[in-house]
Curated annotation (Swiss-Prot):
Catalytic center residues: C328 (cysteine persulfide intermediate)
UniProt binding sites for [2Fe-2S] cluster: C328
Listed GO biological process terms: [2Fe-2S] cluster assembly
UniProt cofactor(s): pyridoxal 5'-phosphate
Residues engaged in binding pyridoxal 5'-phosphate: A75, T76, N155, Q183, S203, A204, H205, T243
Record's keyword annotation contains Oxidoreductase: no
InterPro entries, sorted: Aminotrans_V_dom (IPR000192), Aminotrans_V_PyrdxlP_BS (IPR020578), Cys_deSase_IscS (IPR010240), Cysteine_dSase (IPR016454), PyrdxlP-dep_Trfase (IPR015424), PyrdxlP-dep_Trfase_major (IPR015421), PyrdxlP-dep_Trfase_small (IPR015422)
PROSITE patterns for the chain: AA_TRANSFER_CLASS_5
Protein name as annotated: Cysteine desulfurase IscS
Signal sequence segment: none
Pathway named in the protein's UniProt entry: Cofactor biosynthesis; iron-sulfur cluster biosynthesis
Organism of derivation: Photorhabdus laumondii subsp. laumondii (strain DSM 15139 / CIP 105565 / TT01)
Length: 404
């Protein structure tokens, strides 16, 4: 077993060696290096064929038509293109958008930008387990609502939203429905022939593909229109201009192919490992599970350790690569906005750690992590005056703290 142990698979994943090997054939003179838009010679044709194969591999995993897959630079761009693209195209019908407070920053910040441009956005608060109440969603819909954006799996707590039910509601009311599936694709089954989802964002680097490549699913029947956000050459059927990075696209395709093949067995394995981790730490005093194990994605476990500061816990767990919150926001010392939206107080939100498991996580690593967490929590609480006061039965909320 090598230290440190990587338990931050929701931030990014290592590229699978099978993916890296395939990508290497699309970079140098010895391989296929042409521009897929070069239609006049073999170099371009071979590159175009490689892109077509990858497009099919991605479509196969999610039950889409390959013509519905638009390549982007990643899920952040896909979210931007979906939300701004649909809002701009359908704004004559209305200017109201609905999303949730626990979305990824790529969705929230895009909605904030649209507010500056004159759109109105309703941000729904989830229930304490992280799930959106469908009655709340229905109640928020107005005559001028044109777009609803709800993520499939939350990147911090792993809760799985009922996108099938939300999709039915949107379709019956003629509202465009966007889903950010970055954390669910390749881990949970997605079948877009059955789901009433109009736009769906994907990434490669969360399922053992390369960084810097993603895709947006844009439904053809009933046809959904979006306005391009990037111009210059009309690539990707006019929705996203720019030379296609063949090696990255091939990597994404191969990663999605492997995910389809291994998803069922791997999801079961990860569920088992996550349960082993939770069983190993749940008896520590004042430990709380954030999210919902029943409705949770198989790879994420978010836990709060009361009376322990999250940053100091991460320092003392230096042999475990874990995060507090998501990578996009964990550089700040603000408590997680996702946990705050679940109604959690700052102290508990500050003491939360996200463990995310993946393809290369072993039982041995989980057992080592359990032992290390027990030791670290014990040591940090010995140093904590708050813990001592709590043990003595002092109600910490009743104390008047003096501010310096």
């Amino acid at each position: 077993m090598k230290l440190p142990i990587y338990l931050d698979y929701s931030a990014t994943t290592p590229v699978d060696p099978r993916v890296a090997e395939k990508m290497m054939n699309y970079l140098t003179r010895d391989g296929i290096f042409g521009n897929p838009a070069s239609r006049s010679h073999r170099f371009g044709w071979q590159a175009e064929e490689a892109v077509d194969i990858a497009r099919n591999q991605i479509a196969d995993l999610v039950g889409a038509d390959p013509r519905e897959i638009v390549f982007t630079s990643g899920a952040t761009e896909s979210d931007n293109l979906a939300i701004k693209g649909a809002a701009n195209f359908y704004q004559k019908k209305g200017k109201h958008i609905i999303t949730s407070k626990t979305e990824h920053k790529a969705v929230l910040d895009t909605c904030r930008q649209l507010e500056r441009e004159g759109f109105e956005v309703t941000y729904l608060a989830p229930q304490s387990n992280g799930l959106i109440d469908l009655n709340d969603l229905e109640a928020a819909v107005r005559d001028d609502t044109i777009l609803i954006s709800i993520m499939h799996v939350n990147n911090e707590i792993g809760v799985v939203q009922d996108i099938a039910a939300i999709g039915e509601m949107c379709r019956s009311r003629g509202i465009v429905f966007h889903v950010d599936a970055t954390q669910s694709v390749g881990k949970l089954p997605i079948d877009l022939t059955k789901l009433k989802v109009d736009l769906m964002s994907f990434s490669a680097h969360k399922i053992y593909g390369p960084m810097g490549i993603g895709a947006l699913y844009v439904r053809r029947k009933p046809r959904i229109r979006i306005e391009a956000q990037q111009h210059g050459g009309g690539h990707e059927r006019g929705m996203r201009s720019g030379t296609l990075p063949v090696h990255q696209i091939v990597g994404m395709g191969e990663a999605y192919r492997i995910a389809k093949q291994e998803m069922e067995s791997e999801s079961q394995r990860l569920r088992g490992l996550r349960l082993r981790l939770w069983q190993g730490i749940k008896d520590i005093e004042e430990v709380f599970l954030n999210g919902d194990l029943e409705h949770g994605a198989p790879h994420i476990l978010n836990v709060s350790f009361n009376y322990v500061e999250g940053e100091s816990l991460m320092m003392s767990l230096k042999d475990l690569a874990v995060s507090s919150g998501s990578a996009c926001t964990s550089a700040s010392l603000e408590p997680s906005y996702v946990l705050r939206a679940l109604g959690m107080n700052d102290e508990l939100a500050h003491s939360s750690i996200r463990f995310s498991l993946g393809r290369f996580t072993t039982e041995e690593e989980i057992d080592y992590a359990i032992e290390l967490i027990h030791k670290s929590i014990g040591r940090l609480r010995e140093l904590s005056p708050l813990w001592e006061m709590f043990r003595q039965g002092v109600d910490l909320n009743s104390i008047e703290w003096s501010h310096h």
